[in-house]
Regions:
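Conserved Nudix-box catalytic region and its N-terminal flanking loop in Nudix hydrolases
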Residues: 1-40, 44, 48-56
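Active-site-adjacent beta-strand/loop module that shapes the phosphate/pyrophosphate-binding cleft
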Residues: 34, 55-83, 150
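Ordered hydrophobic segments in well-structured contexts
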Residues: 1-2, 13, 69-71, 94
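Nudix hydrolase/Nudix homology domain
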Residues: 9-17, 76-198
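Aromatic side chains
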Residues: 49-51, 72, 155
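Glycine-rich loops and low-complexity Gly/Arg-rich segments
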Residues: 27, 38-40, 69-74, 97-100, ...
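A generic structural signal for short, non-catalytic loop/turn and secondary-structure boundary residues
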Residues: 7, 40, 65-67, 86-89
Length: 198
């Protein structure tokens, strides 16, 4: 995954920018922003997902209106870009270590499941069964297999519980305290990790 981090005191971000009048289409805007920010010319581009939820992150709550984010998958040639300052290639698993089953079940999954178990245990009686089912399906808890296609659902569940730092940064109402957030995974600015999960 190509990320940008011009300011090392802040989390990295995906290449991005607003649609502007100079962009004839959404794809033209995407190509312009990626080339300007990373030096790469994009090859094949496919739109994957659109996010338009109200109040998705702190900066969206501070401004009137709604922010629309569109996630793309784009391919680039392996050659060196014209410039790459503040950009680097990172493993997708840096952002989702609980998804890395290449060497068997990831160690981090036990602490994730402990956090989820606490969230379920403290649920009001009428919500407990729903939380159990959602967690069982998303995280392959006893009685359910691990489904590698549920990356977004797992991330959104961890966000809702408060087990990822972005939930606390965004001021989301969540069950887990800030100290319980999983710090063994790298976060991204705004809702970029959610977009990456698609």
């Amino acid at each position: 995954v190509l990320v940008r981090q011009p300011d090392t005191s802040r989390p990295a971000s995906l290449p991005s920018g607003p649609l502007e009048p100079r962009h004839r289409t959404l794809e033209a805007g995407l190509r312009t922003w990626v080339e300007e920010q990373t030096g790469y010319d994009l090859g094949y581009v496919e739109q994957l997902y659109s996010f338009g939820d109200a109040n998705r992150h702190a900066s969206a709550r501070a401004q009137p209106g709604r922010m629309l984010s569109i996630g793309y998958l784009a391919l680039v040639h392996e050659s060196k870009p014209r410039r790459m300052e503040a950009s680097e290639w990172r493993s997708w698993y840096d952002f989702f270590p609980w998804e890395d089953w290449r060497d068997g079940e990831p160690e981090i999954l036990s602490s994730v499941r402990d956090g989820i178990a606490g969230w379920i245990a403290e649920a009001p009686r009428d919500e407990r069964k729903s939380r159990e089912e959602r967690s069982r399906v998303a995280f392959g808890l006893p009685g359910s297999p691990w489904n590698e296609e549920l990356v977004l659902e797992r991330y959104e569940l961890l966000y809702e519980i408060g087990l990822v730092p972005e939930a606390h940064r965004d001021g989301a109402a969540c069950w887990a305290p800030r100290e319980a957030a999983i710090m063994d995974a790298d976060s991204l600015q705004a809702d970029h990790r959610r977009i990456l999960a698609t």
